[in-house]
Amino acid sequence: DPLYISTIGINEKTLSLYKYMGYKVGYLNHYYIVNTHKKDFRIIGNFDGHFHNETLRDKSKRLIRYDKAELLSLCNDNGHSIRASNVVPKKSFYFFYQRFFCHPIYTYSIYGLFQYDLLLGLIALRVIAHNTSRVLQIVDYFGNAAGLDGLIDGFQDLLQEYNAEYIDFYNIGLPSDMLAKSGFIMREHSKKRRTLPHRR
């Protein structure tokens, strides 16, 4: 029997069935950071001027993009690892390579999260375009949650590089205070003042 089963996007009509079978069901948390260099927003609705959570900046951390060959080389290098022994589920470099660089439909970018020369985590990112506007979506992160602390400058650099309105992140399990320390704002379901479209 597997130790861990999860899914997203289940039909609301089947929620009672999953609850009856003993599964925990709920909603993913939605976090975002807005590009501080943007003044004209075509995707965000009713922007209130709150770009990101105020947080300390950790200048020792940076994001480095991996191309396909570089990530594949990590798959064969036992000297590289991510120190995330307490993270569930377990993922490997090869998982990221197969899942994101070999996807038959979508194009993803993979970034290594480094503190100095130590690899703390991997981030999978997708660019979503609508007319002339772009947003970035983190679709996967593997690593220690604390590795994201102080990374606001790295996320703002990505937003400026892609000329995107915002970067967002749906997840459950990562502590909200940890994500706040990386600059992310948690979107409240009850608040209508800012609109961030849900995308498939």
Regions found by a protein language model. Name each.
Residues 1, 59-61, 117:
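Intrinsic-disorder/low-complexity loop/linker signature
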Residues 2-55, 115, 122-149, 153-200:
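Active-site/acyl-donor-binding loops of N-acyltransferases
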Residues 7-12, 28, 64-144:
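A conserved beta-strand-loop-helix scaffold within acyl/acetyltransferase catalytic domains
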Residues 23-24, 60-64, 69, 108, ...:
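Short glycine-aromatic motifs
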Residues 43-74:
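Conserved N-terminal entry element of GNAT/NAT acetyltransferase domains
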